[in-house]
């Protein structure tokens, strides 16, 4: 006989079914008093690292700061209470941190794949949720919107019955409870829910790729060869042309992916299929935002000799030649400024930078060039 229990991993649907006049429950998920209980703070991660360093379980040349720098973009940035945002440190996912540390301590090196395979069960849940009934189109739009913008505005719902699971607010709330979204601020009386980190972002892109490949199959061998040529030889044209051709050929979902923002989502999903690079969309350089920075993953692949910044420009199908010429000129000026940025230069790790401008009109690539010469 239990007088009091604490239950973890409870969804809003389960909570709705459990609570009644006979079962009194308190949902502490978004209670700011418990925000830091649901993960590791950076200080706690550093304590863990120092413990293993002092025990001699981590190599001397692997520093505390280098480990934090490695895992922060992949496992950090969770916030579970609106009142805690901006006031308390963001939280690391404890499972993901332990996955990394298990490799580092047990095998002597960081995992080659930074995506924690344990979190991929959430991806399976995501697919099942989307296809649960005949109204999946609206939920697909939500997933696309989140993947392409990196956030969505909504109100979180603490509990609801199963029959209302697929309503907009409830569906978005489920994504939050499954760890696919976290609190990133407020907009009026709504929350700005964001993709917390690269580990989760890749799960969204994997869903998009599954959807795209159901329409237009992905030749993995050809794509691998194209990434090899781009990373090792600096021959980027096969890679960019492959992705642009796939964008053109995916005719059945043209209405869904038309537009510059959706083009970026499509490009991002394909670029994440390599481990040679860490893909950084919308990174700030010289007070502007570069569409893509292909940051060499030098810690794992020191043989990579070439890095890339991409500027995507989209024109509607009825745009004039004058529109295209003006847009191209602006893109060239933009990417030259980005390429000269000191912060960007410091991140190249000795690789040769290739600034690439891609101009799409409708569904067709009309101009693809490297600015400043090269292949």
Predicted features, each with a name:
Residues 11-15, 315, 362:
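Short, solvent-exposed loop/turn segments at secondary-structure junctions
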Residues 6-10, 17, 185-187:
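Glycine-rich, histidine-containing beta strand-loop boundary motifs that form or position
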Residues 12-20, 28-102:
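Amphipathic alpha-helical segments of the small helical/lid subdomains adjacent to P-loop NTPase cores
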Residues 343-375:
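Domain-level recognition of nuclease-like catalytic cores that cleave nucleotide substrates
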Residues 1-3:
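Substrate-engagement module of ASCE P-loop NTPases
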Residues 25, 90-333, 337-339, 368-375:
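Extended alpha-helical interface modules used as scaffolds for assembling large macromolecular complexes
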Residues 6, 308-310, 354-358:
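Hydrophobic/aromatic beta-strand patches that form the interior of the parallel beta-sheet core
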Residues 16-21, 366-370:
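A short acidic (Asp/Glu
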């Amino acid at each position: 006989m239990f007088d009091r229990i604490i239950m973890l991993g409870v969804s809003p649907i389960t909570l709705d079914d459990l609570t009644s006049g006979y079962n009194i429950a308190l949902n502490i998920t978004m209670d700011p008093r418990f925000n830091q209980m649901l993960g590791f703070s950076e200080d706690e991660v550093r304590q863990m690292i120092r413990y293993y360093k002092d025990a001699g379980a981590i190599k001397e040349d692997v520093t505390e700061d280098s480990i934090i720098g490695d895992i922060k973009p992949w496992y950090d940035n969770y916030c579970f209470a609106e009142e805690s945002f901006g006031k308390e440190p963001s939280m690391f996912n404890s499972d993901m941190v332990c996955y990394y540390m298990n490799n580092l301590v047990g095998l002597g090196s960081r995992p080659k794949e930074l995506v924690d395979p344990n979190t991929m069960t959430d991806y399976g849940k995501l697919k099942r949720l989307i296809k649960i009934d005949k109204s999946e189109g609206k939920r697909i739009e939500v997933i696309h919107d989140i993947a392409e913008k990196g956030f969505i505005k909504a109100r979180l719902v603490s509990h609801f019955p199963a029959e209302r699971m697929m309503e907009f607010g409830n569906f978005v709330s489920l994504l939050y409870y499954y760890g696919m979204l976290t609190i990133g601020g407020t907009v009026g009386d709504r929350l700005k829910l964001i993709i917390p980190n690269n580990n989760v972002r890749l799960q969204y892109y994997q869903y998009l790729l599954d959807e795209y490949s159901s329409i237009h199959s992905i030749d993995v061998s050809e794509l691998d060869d194209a990434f090899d040529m781009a990373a090792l030889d600096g021959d980027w044209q096969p890679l960019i042309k492959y992705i642009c051709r796939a964008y053109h050929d995916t005719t059945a979902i043209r209405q869904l992916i038309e537009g510059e923002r959706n083009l970026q989502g499509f490009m991002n999903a394909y670029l994440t299929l390599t481990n040679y690079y860490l893909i950084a969309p919308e990174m700030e350089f010289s007070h502007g935002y570069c569409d893509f920075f292909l940051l060499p993953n030098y810690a794992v692949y020191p043989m990579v000799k070439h890095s890339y910044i991409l500027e995507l420009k989209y024109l509607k199908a009825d745009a004039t030649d004058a529109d295209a010429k003006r847009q191209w000129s602006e893109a060239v000026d933009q990417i030259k400024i980005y390429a000269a940025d000191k912060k960007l230069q410091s991140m190249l790790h000795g690789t040769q930078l290739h600034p690439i401008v891609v101009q799409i009109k409708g569904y067709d690539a009309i101009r693809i060039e490297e600015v400043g010469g090269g292949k």
